[in-house]
Regions:
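Positively charged, small/polar-rich N-terminal and surface patches that mediate targeting and assembly
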Residues: 1-117
Length: 117
């Protein structure tokens, strides 16, 4: 199958992923919602939040989804595919707000499978 995204049309982007506890808040708002809203206000075209069903972090404590838990402590990934300057803007925003988060920033090639998007 031919590659529909040539080097001339591929977008050089980064995948910026923040890892947030689902009950973590900032200014009385869930942090993942606050981060998505701030990205939108700053002209970022899109972002997504994904909730884990189980996770553990640097402290080694396993967190799992249980039916009876409300507002648990599982991980939310907030993911943006953005230009490097936009990633820097988001990271600066988080730093200015004194929010401590783990994140990854990975270079990716992105594009569309059809020229009629």
């Amino acid at each position: 199958m031919p590659n529909t995204t040539t080097p001339n049309t591929a977008l050089q982007t980064v995948c910026l992923t923040f890892y947030i506890h689902e009950n973590q808040q900032h200014h009385h708002t869930l942090l993942y919602e606050w981060l998505l809203e701030q990205a939108k206000k700053n002209g970022i075209w899109g972002g997504s939040a994904f909730r884990a069903i189980a996770s553990f972090g640097r402290h080694g404590q396993l967190q799992e989804d249980h039916f009876f838990e409300l507002g648990g402590n599982l991980t939310i990934q907030v993911i943006f595919f953005v230009q490097e300057a936009e990633a820097a803007l988001l990271l600066d925003l988080v730093e200015r707000e004194n929010i401590v988060l783990f994140y990854t920033r990975t270079p990716v090639d992105s594009g569309y499978t059809s020229p009629h998007h």
